[in-house]
């Protein structure tokens, strides 16, 4: 994103359809690993209630957030709350607020839940529209000490609202960040059986929920959409002089930005409000 619980076993299917590997295709014949669920937020609660404060904190302000974003992030229920149906709703609105023309929300698990190696996933329905920028991402917990990009960043899912059929998974660290980050696009796939009515296709991503995931290993990171691996980065193939900070603790960030260099400003075609719905966020560790 930045440019400048219930214990149970989970068997992950490593589907290879749509596989696009950054740097090297490797391990396609590996056996699927078995993951144990360690932590999750299922966003169950009364409509209008705040996300669980044991897990989530708010980023508040209208500083542009290093990306020339246009919104003011708030902690108001109008911008972030549970919807009463088991979803977290993050809503971007067009309204004057604290000198900005838009409001939205950005929440994080900093100092509440931070982990290193493992599998992170979320089931999300993204919003759409010119200038709308939803994201599910991880930031290194040592950001206050070392800064960005040295802390590392994993963008599990970013979508440009004007192109809601395409999403990106990206790594940022020292030696590969901003415009030089290690990124890969994934285009929403419509199954042949859903090519015509009465089946309802799940594309673009704004039409329905999809599971976005990243598996962080000691020297390899894999990105998935709906169980399909489309992006893999290996530490041993990085250029000399780059860093690999991804074995250290990271925390989760969920947000909907408005405007910024990545997506551009909203225009007359953009409909407000725009809401990102999150069914759950989960973290797994490999079974021992």
Predicted regions and their residues:
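Bacterial N-terminal signal peptides that target proteins for export
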Residues: 2-16
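C-terminal motif of bacterial Sec signal peptides marking the signal peptidase cleavage site
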Residues: 24-27
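GH16 jelly-roll
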Residues: 29-288
